[in-house]
Amino acid sequence: MPAKYRALIVTFLAFHIDTLLYYFLVPLLPHYANKLRFSSFQIGILFGSYALALLAATYPAGRLTDRYGRKKPMLWGLFGLMIATALFAWSTNFAWLLLARCLQGAAGALTWVPGMALIADHFPNEERGRALSITFMGANLGVFLGPTLAGYLATHFSYRSPFYVGIILIIIDTLGRLFFVEDVVNVEKSETIPIRCLLGHSRIQVFMIAMMLATVLWSFLESVLPIYLDRRFLSTPQQIGWIFGFLAVMHGLTSPIIGSLTDRIGRPTVLRLGLWAMIFLIILPSWMPSSLAVGLLLGGIGLATTFIISPCSPGVAAEIEQMGSRAYASGFSMLSFSYSAGMVVGSFLGGVLVGPLGLSVSLGCLSLLCVGLLVFSYQVEAHPSLN
């Protein structure tokens, strides 16, 4: 099998297992809340700690990946994920669970950053968008399957059983990273790109803001819509799960298609199409007449999210190549930083906006953020000297 397809399989599996294990915790929250007497504040801290650890670890992960290659950091990440998963299975107090969640976030950075860099190494610019989107489809499959599998195992066996299955999956993932991953470049220390160069590049700024904005929108909806659906339509937990599952499925299934589109018509064009759609779609959930209508609308939002996210990784890789470097991980660490920051900001906005402003006005504010990025994107394209 060609090396690039081995890299694609390993990265697909890595992203899938990382996301699957992240979402294992969702159906187990009632257990922690009831049996271990955790407060809603502690539950919120558990979720937020993952994003904060991911946020803190992303740039160091990029520097390590560009210095030591892709394979070693991916294996280090699995070691941390193994410890975190074992802690989840056996922890009986908040402190150990918090440590597990932080380790899981740091391990995620050592999976995503070198994983994206591995794909960029093996696939040329004209194939990179589709390849990266296929790996993201693995992550979205984890979003859909994680809560379902964990809920089934916890119901029919024990609340520890999902994490035992997780350890088995990590072992399989380890074998793949050990024997299938091949580093095709050795990036020397002198070739790493200073962070100020990345942050000062206007096109990279556009892609970073786009990644953060898409994650803000997603996290905002996850934090406020379940309560809205419960109160307005009396939706059951299962119905809410299917509604958000449809969002994840639409995003995941369309990723390879939109990824190929970015390779054909250009990353900025695809990004702007997504922003134009999101400007109008994001204001509509509070106007839907039924939970079914909300679910169908979320499918459209999932598709628009794909248009926004898919151009980001291959776009950053292309800009790094134009700088005369192959230090992709440094650029991808900035995207991962934006992603994790978006998780934190989206949940925060859901908590502070909806109460005083209401859902409709809050969604209108998010639409204005999309307008702002769209204007900035056109400005950057109209003034190439900014790059």
Which positions does each model-derived feature cover?
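Helix-breaking motifs and short loop linkers at transmembrane-helix boundaries and internal kinks
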Residues: 37, 69, 90-96, 234, ...
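Conserved MFS/SLC helix-loop-helix module at the cytosolic interface between two early adjacent transmembrane helices
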Residues: 56-92, 262-268
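C-terminal membrane-cytosol helix-exit motif in multi-pass small-molecule transporters
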Residues: 168-186, 376-380
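Juxtamembrane intracellular "pre-TM" segments in multi-pass secondary transporters
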Residues: 1-2, 182-208
